[in-house]
């Protein structure tokens, strides 16, 4: 009798949990939470979770909690595919997120399309499919974006060079990074620069000296790198060990602010679209408070991207009528404007034709030896995102 009562109680508990789950907005995430790429992606998800917990603590969205289901793919395509299948078929998520290397995109996109569920790239590089004319199901809020970043970086190089530019290139051997550095090489020629060497390293390389050696031998006065941070910074450090004294511009990933302070090299420039904590905008205090309560192990300077992702999720769900379906969420995402409160140069805006943003704003920072601090050397420069 006791055994039967226990089974009945468990069944009631299971039913109650299921009912509660149906009352939540269920969002699925496949992310590189472990493995070599985790330092770039895990902080995004941890900060996003902290933001969602903060929202839930205030009553959720439209009176309903947001449930995040996060699965680790270790930046492996096969794991990302399995995660996407489970989240879509078993958990019935109304939105799927990818925060991993671009090598995981193809299987994730395929599963999302098959299930007709919107796919949101958060913390992972924005694929061109999110640019106008956008793929109907793919969206991205991540700071960095193919082609536009190289346009902004090389414009800065040109504006800050009195001598002829001899440009070296460095990238990781992953699809989007390789394509972007090839694009930048072609773009440099149209700007009157001379591309002198391009080095592509495996993900990750145990030693970057061979790649740096080839770059140094070509005698560039600038090097541009656009890849995961490990590739960017280790190539730079290897060049410095070899005695190269030129200027190096690279993408401002999550850890760039801390790394500028560690390296203290005035000729290392980082280009980005998220305000650094050194910029001290008011919402930085909220990020500190929310992520402190969540006891996140990463430095607060790593967490802006994830906070933005949480803001985007909240805004999309607020515009989604209850009960949520993937189609309702998609309709909300197709007409979305998110006030980022100074974390970027303007709001993030998606339209039916543009799932990236309508404007991309860039700043550039470096270490100032005289001030013994990180300083901004270029304020927000806007690039219109068009067809």
Where on the chain are the PLM-derived regions?
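Short, low-complexity disordered leader/linker segments with a strong preference
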Residues: 1-26, 385-387
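Immediate post-signal peptide segment of exported/extracytoplasmic ligand-binding proteins
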Residues: 18-29, 60-65, 158-165
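Beta-alpha junction/loop-to-helix N-cap segments that form part of ligand/metal-binding clefts
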Residues: 24-26, 39-46, 58-131, 201-208, ...
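Extracytoplasmic "Venus flytrap"
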Residues: 25-49, 71-78, 100-101, 170-179, ...
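Hydrophobic alpha-helical segments within soluble ligand-binding/sensing domains
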Residues: 80, 127, 141-166, 206-209, ...
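Extracytoplasmic ligand/sensor domains, especially the bilobed periplasmic-binding protein
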Residues: 93-198, 245-264
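Extracellular/periplasmic periplasmic-binding protein-like sensory domains
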Residues: 143, 236-307, 379-385
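Segments of small-molecule ligand-sensing domains
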Residues: 293-303, 314-374
